[in-house]
From Swiss-Prot:
Protein name, entry field: Methylamine utilization protein MauL
SUPFAM superfamilies from the UniProt entry: Cupredoxins
Main function: Probably involved in TTQ prosthetic group biosynthesis.
Pathway: One-carbon metabolism; methylamine degradation
InterPro entries per record: Cupredoxin, MauL
Organism classification: Bacteria, Pseudomonadati, Pseudomonadota, Betaproteobacteria, Nitrosomonadales
Taxonomy, superkingdom: Bacteria
Length: 157
């Protein structure tokens, strides 16, 4: 029987965990702390794993007049390559895949001066695959990119 409103049922209920007796309020606090730690550990694990998956890089290629400027990167599967048109003429860059598929890098097929187009190396690209960047308008503009797959993606012998 309750004497007044301050005496709540949950304050009088006791639980036994092992040899320790805890009130219901202590259980709630314990569960909250446990859930908080579980959340933090799970979030940390997911961020660690996803940072490995997010290891793709963004590379820059510069297009000036009738040639690509020399580049110093080796593309890996999943890397994005941004191609910036620094010339004062229009270009129309496309990529030829190793299997012969051709992909335009601009919806209009024209890359105006100052415009940047992007291409992402396919995730299923294999070590040694060669992707050729060319211009539809100026066929002399050509760059061959050989993919170097990370060791973790190479098949075991």
């Amino acid at each position: 029987m309750l004497r007044n409103r301050t005496d709540a049922v949950h304050d009088r209920v006791r639980f036994s965990i092992g040899t320790r007796v805890m009130s219901s309020w202590s259980i709630v606090v314990w569960m909250f702390h446990r859930q908080t730690w579980q959340f933090l550990l799970t979030t940390g694990f997911i961020l660690c794993i996803s940072s490995i998956a997010w290891s793709a890089e963004v590379h820059q290629m510069e297009l000036t007049h009738h040639e690509f400027e020399p580049w110093s990167f080796v593309p890996k599967p999943g890397d994005r390559i941004d191609i910036h048109n620094h010339s004062d003429i229009v270009h129309a860059i496309y990529v030829t895949y190793p299997n012969g598929i051709v992909v335009n890098l601009s919806e209009t097929a024209a890359q105006l001066p100052g415009m940047t187009v992007s291409w992402t190396v396919p995730e299923d690209a294999e070590d040694g695959d060669e992707y050729v960047l060319q211009c539809w308008i100026h066929t002399i503009i050509r760059a061959a990119l050989k993919v170097k797959a990370p060791l973790s993606q190479l098949p075991e012998p």
